């Protein structure tokens, strides 16, 4: 190459280097000119072309131009917006799904709550049926034991008579044989050996029949099973000291009807029990069976007194024997005293009264024998009454027992008279009542009592519906339990026992089978089947006018709610107390309390009528009684003979 050629090359490189460093628009771009399609609008990017969008040190020589950068930003923005829209739609779907799930959860929760409620109701019905079944089983066992005792006595009697017949035949044959040749008249006697053989076979067959008594399933054993099942149905209440009756406690706890609070009161039992005199205390089972067993199953009976011996002794005064039930076996008890329903109002004596058939031992773990009916007074320990606080249940505020009969048959220690908390079927709240467990088999719920006139019984219908008055643990006080509570206790067939006492100390009683209707039916009293010594005042009424004085089927009437049959006025207003009144009355135990007994109606303004505490068939309408008591007890399951 010549010198001239080298010079031209150097000049060209110098120019190119200068153009590169100047950055002028007129200089040549290293990337060269861009191709522009005919459809593109170049003017829209003209401003960006003059703008330095990047630095050489950062991007290098391939830095994109303004139009390309704008396109990339636009594409990125669209992609971001698309993602935002997609996320927004997903969020909306999630919100909708959450709403649906919440609604489904609410519906499932409602169904679950309903299932739990239905299960609680089913549990309540189940345990009520279980309780009824338990009582029926115990009752059937006692009746069966009574019948087995009868059969055993009949078998023994047949065996004894068979032996006597055989002995008489032998004696007769011997006597006739020894008379031959010495008697004025010859008698031929032939012993029927074939018949005797048949009698012996029949007697042997009867002796082979097993007539052993059933071991009675007492309620304590059932209570243990219920304790194990408390995870489904525990009884309500707190500690045993607050929720269960305490035997022998002398506190002034009182029965006032329905309780408004949720706490369970301490329950007291007095040391003495009110008695309406020498009442026949035999239970219905004892009166029906009316026999005594020939042997005792329990080992304790073998060492008992002559009243519980294995030999059967018929009382000369009563000509019958009573069946006395103990925990396991049936033992003999002979009545040695006067059996009468005309009784005196006396306190329970601690001394032995064998002439009246009443014996009481005052020991700590004694056995009461009243009219030769033995009751075990072992009330258990405080731990027996402890509830299972770890049990699972939604029903923590319900009482375990429905009435006094339920307390007697199921509650350990429930054989003592006193205050107990019960909850009849259908009741919304617990009810504190006085239970009489010593009269005619026990299980009686006190609903009315007059004894000193300290309480005014001329009250409004609402007061009679809710109840008023109190009694203590010993059963002293004046009380009207309340029509609503009485309806819950006697809306099914029940026995109503009316106990009366005059000012001379003599007493009488009347028992009826009753059913009480609800408020919509005016608490009408359906009454039938009278038995007792006080006279049938409720059904028969006054002899001169039975149709207008009978109380059967009558609604409850007060001075402010006149539902009686008298068209000329209000019987309740005239006679001074609410009652089941016709037009007007043969009995009213809620009348005006007059001291002394007999009274002159003409001296009792303003109406001058027989408005005392009366039972016309007992002492007449002009005699105001000193003490009265009305008690209810459910009718137990009848046994078809």
Swiss-Prot record:
Parts of the chain that traverse the membrane: none
Pfam families: Fib_alpha, Fibrinogen_C
GO molecular function terms noted in the UniProt entry: extracellular matrix structural constituent; protein-macromolecule adaptor activity; signaling receptor binding
InterPro entries assigned: FIB_ANG-like, Fibrinogen-like_C, Fibrinogen_a/b/g_C_1, Fibrinogen_a/b/g_C_dom, Fibrinogen_a/b/g_coil_dom, Fibrinogen_CS
Cited function: Fibrinogen has a double function: yielding monomers that polymerize into fibrin and acting as a cofactor in platelet aggregation.
NCBIfam families given in the database record: GGGWT_bact (NF040941)
Name this protein carries in UniProt: Fibrinogen alpha-2 chain
The organism of origin for this protein: Petromyzon marinus (Sea lamprey)
